[in-house]
Amino acid sequence: MARRVLGQGHPGALPLWEHFVLNELHARLQTRDVRYWRDKQGHEVDFVLARRGRHPVAIECTWSVDAFEPAGMRSFRGRYPEGESFVVAPDAVPASTRTVGGVRVRFVDLETLVRALGKR
């Protein structure tokens, strides 16, 4: 949606995409267990699904799979090694899994992310 409205290169497009993903997670998963993570060095993960008794799920939003920068995810997984790591991007079709920067990451579109998280 944000990609259509503002265009990929627009400076406000990525925050709009992140907000859209957050709204979809809240609405479709019916949860408020979505958090944000940032360390003192400035590494961050857009969203962390922190459900009681389960390993944290890390979610990064990006416009394309090629634009993913693994520093935040790597720092998060260094501290919390258990759990899945997702990158949600409009062009992540078909979904794929690969290791980037030493972290195993699943690249998915938004619909695939919601379906995968809904099964947990």
Describe each model-derived feature in a short phrase.
Residues 1-120:
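A cross-kingdom feature that marks ATP-driven nucleic-acid transaction machinery
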